[in-house]
């Protein structure tokens, strides 16, 4: 590749990346500048944006997280000025990244398209919608099931020793966002397995042959991401991932069988 061609590709990549950054920044700024005001419309509650940087949507999300996730008896506090603000910035940025993810995927696919085979492009299109759905499912599972249980479990350990718990807002938000991202990404596992098999990088039996190493890696990941050493909470991470691995193995093998049948 000549220096001129490389420069053209770099400029194209910069333009596409800039679009993603602009959308992410716009969504982040919107959440920090507007308040979601409820209103009644034909008997249903709807929300519309109202300029209010103090009681913004990021603050509303933070308050909802506090009410839904913080165990009863635990106080959410800030220990230095500005912690609550930066917690809201983190939340707004995560929402911005999430909203811009489909755009990022589209821009990346458009950039790589000239170098991809038609079969690889088809695989990418077929997994785009399921990827978004699985990411949302992973975040929902983490928010509804995993995070409340882990926080309550760890709080009760302290309570049994007569310890009063005060939870720093930055630590709380970082903890929640860590789990949301970890589960959103880990729920992509079956799609990654399917795509790798469909693109011909490995055969369908590869996942079954290496299952012991995969399970060991999943358990280590579960132990690493959970904050305690009890060996209990890690299974809330490892358990679903093991199920997802088996699901990915099933779909990868089924696709390979279909291709062999079609080629016979």
Curated annotation (Swiss-Prot):
Bilayer disposition of the protein: Multi-pass membrane protein
Pfam families: TatC (PF00902)
UniProt key word Oxidoreductase: no
Keywords annotated in UniProt: Cell membrane, Membrane, Protein transport, Translocation, Transmembrane, Transmembrane helix, Transport
GO BP, sorted A to Z: intracellular protein transmembrane transport; protein transport by the Tat complex
Membrane-crossing residue ranges in chain numbering: 20-40, 85-105, 131-151, 175-195, 211-231, 232-252
Cystine bridges: none
Main location: membrane
Coiled coil: none
GO cellular component: TAT protein transport complex
Database matches in InterPro entries: TatC (IPR002033)
Intracellular or extracellular location(s): Cell membrane
Single GO molecular function: proton motive force dependent protein transmembrane transporter activity
Alphabetized HAMAP family for the sequence: TatC (MF_00902)
Binding partners and assembly: Forms a complex with TatA.
Family: Belongs to the TatC family.
Stated role: Part of the twin-arginine translocation (Tat) system that transports large folded proteins containing a characteristic twin-arginine motif in their signal peptide across membranes.
Protein known as: Sec-independent protein translocase protein TatC
Protein source organism: Cenarchaeum symbiosum (strain A)
